[in-house]
Amino acid sequence: MSYVIDRRLNGKNKSTVNRQRFLRRYRDHIKKAVEEAVSRRSITDMEHGEQISIPGRDIDEPVLHHGRGGKQTVVHPGNKEFTTGEHIARPQGGGGGKGPGKAGNSGEGMDEFSFQITQEEFLEFMFEDLELPNLVKRNLTGTDTFKTVRAGISNEGNPSRINIIRTLRSAHARRIALSGSSRAKLREATAELERMKREEPDNFGDIQELEVEIDRLKARIRRVPYLDTFDLKYNLLVKQPNPSSKAVMFCLMDVSGSMTQATKDIAKRFFILLYLFLKRNYDKIDVVFIRHHTSAREVDEEEFFYSRETGGTIVSSALKLMQEIMAARYPSSDWNIYAAQASDGDNWNDDSPICREILTKQIMPFVQYYTYVEITPREHQALWYEYERIGEDFADTFAQQQLVSAGDIYPVFRELFQRRLVS
């Protein structure tokens, strides 16, 4: 019986190639369905697939056929109704028109084609064409950094990196291969010598010949070296370059008393979407979480999203803390610095000009991109207008948007992080 071993990487998903071709072909339909699903779901409910439906008419293959239009000259058999040269009226139907009618007991049609996309495919369509703007390579004038990683086994190398187990295994295999036939002959000769000593003890000549042959075979086996340079195996270490583009995202969230529970929920959903986007699209990125009311604190992910602490409103406290963290841990010469700020716009009146001054002088010259999201259905307040002045001075690296309801989160997010063409 013969066996077929399938060593393909997608052996259990043999139609993966066809599926990818299908997803590319109907990308517009799927992307539209994903956007509708995002607006329908909770932002915290993004990490699973979606049922996609495509109208049947959109998956039909185009075909060429004869139409029903035009004039045709055809000879039909005569009968008592028609005579030679008369024209026959075109039969009714077949024109593909639509009109009012009643239900019938016959006929057929085609439902929409539905299929399920996976979590990975859903997130791919969800974050398609999004990126962190102005991500550049830092330390262009410095030396690249490398890390040493294992890369298998080599026949050459430094003696300090010798792999003892693989070396002894190779030596053992070589000795078996080179002395295998001699050992087989030795076993046969030894067995024959024992038989002759037992059954023919007087046959001294043959016994002596066998003893000489046995000594010769043992000497041949001993001449096979225990360890040869061919057997030496070394651990292969290679230098792998570290990514030169290092990025950090500062997440600043207002948790003051003016933020209602609904407003805080929208802010958290926005940052959850941002966090999901960063962790999925970028392997090497730091995220710094800052919550603020009258004072600001750097917190971990759990406290950022779930703490109930609240208080008054002084937005500049968060900006000052961000600037201190930048100076201490993230020098702009080495890091691509990003920031996303969410607030309802309420702020102590004298503090809004301070915020603009801190941003203009201490933060914006050193960041790649800064986004401000104001969550309010009301008219904008002083903070928004101060930030508008910043946007005029830093048009390429500063953006601000307004959120009114949870349904605005995804469209605004795409607007802020839409991939930009590089001129």
Swiss-Prot record:
Superkingdom: Bacteria
Biased segments, Gly residues type: 92-107
Q: Which InterPro entries match?
A: UPF0229 (IPR006698), vWFA_dom_sf (IPR036465)
Disordered: region residues = 65-110
Q: Which residues cross the membrane?
A: none
Q: Which family does the UniProt entry place this protein in?
A: Belongs to the UPF0229 family.
Protein name as annotated = UPF0229 protein Psyr_4632
